[in-house]
Regions:
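Terminal leader/tail segments of proteins
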Residues: 2-70, 77-147
Length: 147
């Protein structure tokens, strides 16, 4: 009889562990960032289409690292930015309307603010954006209006 009771307790403990793990997974998933929590630094217009984006350091290559968001979705976490543009982030075919790019400084490097340069392109036209992001302030954003 004692063996049956210990098996029940083990099953209950295992069930509690599994439910805790599932709860932890769902409650700690990255939620979308809210545009209202970012400081708007400007806006641009671009024709809709297959949108891509490149991000690199427009100032001194001094160890900046950032988080990059598009429409609230984290697309690059702890991205170290350098003077050469990396491969393009393919954002897909986007419809006309308002979209936004968000930048949060993780490390400002050795000189001033984190200084990402963003090029957003529809395959034919592109627009270059310089954004400043500081560690101890509200993250920065740029509105992109697709026509």
């Amino acid at each position: 009889m004692p063996q049956k009771n210990s098996n029940k307790y083990l099953l209950i403990i295992l069930l509690i562990i599994i439910l805790s793990a599932v709860g932890y997974y769902f409650f700690t998933k990255n939620k979308k960032a809210d545009f209202k929590n970012f400081t708007l630094q400007g806006q641009t217009e671009l024709n809709a289409g297959k949108i891509g984006m490149k991000v690199w350091d427009y100032s001194a290559e001094d160890g900046d690292s950032i988080q990059v968001y598009f429409d609230g979705k984290l697309i690059a976490d702890s991205l170290a930015i350098f003077n050469d543009p990396p491969s393009e982030y393919k954002l897909g075919r986007l419809s006309a309307g308002e979209h936004w790019i968000g930048v949060k400084a993780i490390n400002e490097g050795t000189m001033g603010a984190a200084s990402p340069h963003v090029r957003i392109s529809n395959g034919r036209d592109s627009f270059d954006i310089d954004i400043e992001a500081w560690i101890d302030s509200i993250p920065s954003s740029w509105k992109v209006i697709l026509k």
